[in-house]
Amino acid sequence: MSDPTTDDVRRYIADGLACEHLAVEGDGRHFFATIVSPAFEGQPRVRRHQQVYAALGDRMREQIHALSMKTLTPAEWAAESQRSQHHHH
């Protein structure tokens, strides 16, 4: 079985989790996902990650160690987007 592409990983996550924003970057060996989902509201980071792993199911079992992620609620994402827009030095 060939390694998943960033598009594959993105699709896997989107299939199992309602995301408001989902971006996956990677080089085929390592993946970094930014996942914004209302499902994360009130959840600690560990639970958020568990939800993402559950969404992936067996599809990423081999590569799961290669996936790092940032899990945000829509409110956290909005706050972060606003902050990054105000970085004028």
Residue ranges of model-derived segments:
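N-proximal, solvent-exposed amphipathic alpha-helical segments enriched in charged/polar residues
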Residues: 1-20
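Short edge beta-strands and adjacent turn/loop segments
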Residues: 16-32
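Solvent-exposed beta-strand sheet faces enriched in polar/charged residues
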Residues: 25, 36, 70-72
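Residue-level signature for short turns and capping positions that connect secondary-structure elements
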Residues: 29, 38-40, 74
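A short interface-forming secondary-structure element
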Residues: 34-47
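C-terminal structural segments of small proteins and small subunits
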Residues: 55-89
